[in-house]
Amino acid sequence: MEQNKGRVTIPTDLDVVPQTLEIMDEWGADALRDCDGTEFPQELKNTGAKVYATYCTTRKDNEWAKANPDEVQQMYIMSSFHTATEDSLKIHLMDHLYPAMLKVNDRDDIRKWWEVTDRTTGEVVPVSEWTYEKESGDVVVHPTKRFHEYTVSFLAYIMWDPVNMYNAVVNDWKDVEPQITFDVRQPKTKAHCMEKLRQFLDTHEYVDVIRFTTFFHQFTLIFDELAREKYVDWFGYSASVSPYILQQFEQEVGYPFRPEYIIDQGYMNNTYRIPSKEFEDFQDFQRREVAKLAKEMVDIVHEYGKEAMMFMGDHWIGMEPFMDEFASIGLDAVVGSVGNGATLRLFSDIKGVKYTEGRFLPYFFPDTFYEGGDPVKEAKENWVTARRAILRSPIQRIGYGGYLKLALQFPDFVEYIKDVCREFRTLYDNIRGTTPYCVKRVAVLNCWGKMRSWGNHMVHHAIYYKQNYSYFGIIEALSGAPFDVSFISFDDIRNNPNLLKDIDVIINVGDADTAQSGGENWIDETVITAVKEFVYNGGGFIGVGEPAAHQWQGKFFQLDDILGVEEERGFNLNTDKYNWEEHRDHFILEDSEGEVDFGEGKKNIFALPETEILIQNHQEVQMAVKNFGKGRGVYISGLPYSFKNSRVLYRAVLWSSSAEDQLHCWYSTNYNVEVHAYVKNGKYCVVNNTYEPQDTIVYKGDGSSFELHMDANEIKWYQI
């Protein structure tokens, strides 16, 4: 396709028909879409552009939901903790929850599907010792054990879809009926939804792509009594439940279900929790069942000669695109929201679809497009951040969403996006059909493995958290780095003795006893001996934060012999420490003038006698290196994402794999500028990741070099 047109999707609405045609021409868009709160204008049916229709599988049909209240979508909720000070204790279930969003499910057998837990002992309270008062909404525990803490785990119907509620609150929608979420997995609703899909296809013959949003369960998102976000887990499964589903689960696994398998002491099995066997069984079951039902809908779409696209987000729980079941669904495309490089890799790395599309920011909503707002700034940051990842794992299309009329009020924004669209088309034409040059094979090791590829240290989609940004920086840096990146689990190591032979460097990043670091997996002799053998024979190991950390047999850092450091937790105060000398002239630090931003870092890390400390701060080690046999270990206390830190990580990978001599290969001496080579296509590019001009020396694949001046954000293409 010619370079000035195509590969771009834009939103439209009834009140911007002429303007839509103008933007189509200006941005070179070849696809049009509707959005939540908009309608597709009939006047645009025959523009020659592909037409996307957003199709919500689980909402936008309140008439059905109200007529079938037993098949409204449900979620598990745990009450707050309550301490018993008397023989009887009342726990109000809806405390600190938005009353219009949730409705307690007392229709099904609460003795089976609810659970009262003594959190002081961890024991389940017998059903004979608690009752539910429907009028007050209280669970009464009697008799209690005084000064023990109690919680109630219960089912609630989702009476206001969380995504619809979020959109309504952000956009201040008035007099709009809250959309009820219904459960497509249940028999009556499934039959209704299949027929409804056919009716939609019958009446929308002009639509080319059905953009499913999504299949079929919302990630965990709960609002408090003030309509503020109370709990969010973009990967959360707690809103994918119902007695109907759980009975099927029981039949498959052969043991009775407990609410605690979902509630998990109130942590809701978030991605920092080491998953239990029962929760893994539940996820396996959900993946199979969701994929099976999604395939039925996709098959119907194909029967009508249209494409089926999935939006990766919202009601997407159970789809798991990096797991084996996903390919069986037969989707044509996946579209995802681009928050940064890692969120782009969440869908650009998906196999088994014809194309992937990135919905870029800003979304055309009034929270960005208001008088005094600066949408160009957000657009620049979004594009330049995501571009690193696209250059490693290209998407095939880009797009935008929201209210087009808002964007039109900012001419400089319209002009900038025109440039982005043009740049993307050039980029894609140059790198399509090839794999970029990768200097090393890097594996991120945690409890989740490939299922959470690129989702490590992500709580909500691309949202900053003080407690994890120093770890997420590693993942973001990897998203645009010239490495062949994989994500492996401890079970992968147990099940495949040869797995590590195809890896150059292992990275383990996170806090002790989390799923990211690994916890008790590090006292499994199969795991720890396999990793030690890998490093001893020449592999690299980079540990960030509290890697391989679990108190066991006189150690907290179980790989202290590789990493060369240990954490002082009071148990080693009696042992004197004399190794505090820094060596800031190390290969890893050559581009950073000896200074590194460790973010939150870690306190109380000390070095063992054989270790080379690179940086310590007030006798707390922040970075250290050590040899172990033919291999090497690198310890880093934290590494927030920045261009400088990305270079530090790059050098750490090379050093740990004893590959310092490979530095000057497709390389820029200025860490603000990066080089990506596409040998099969005979092309390479040099990209300025900053908003200022940059000067650098570029090294090509043969080691030859040249000086280069680059404008802000510029990308230059060359023939090899």
Where are these regions (language model features)?
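Polysaccharide-binding and catalytic clefts of secreted carbohydrate-active enzymes
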Residues: 70-328, 346, 432
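Extracellular ligand-binding/catalytic regions of CAZymes and related secreted enzymes
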Residues: 221-224, 405-439, 479, 558, ...
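Noncatalytic N-terminal accessory/assembly modules of large enzymes
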Residues: 2-59, 63-99
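The substrate-binding groove and active-site-proximal loops of carbohydrate-active enzymes
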Residues: 6-12, 29-35, 171-191, 274-291, ...
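Hydrophobic targeting/anchoring helices
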Residues: 44, 64-65, 197-198, 208-215, ...
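Catalytic domains of carbohydrate-active enzymes, especially glycoside hydrolases
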Residues: 9, 15-52, 196-213, 326, ...
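A glycine-rich, often tryptophan-bearing local segment used as a flexible ligand/cofactor-contacting loop or short
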Residues: 518-594, 599-601
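A short, well-structured beta->alpha microelement
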Residues: 8-21, 35-39, 310-319, 475-499
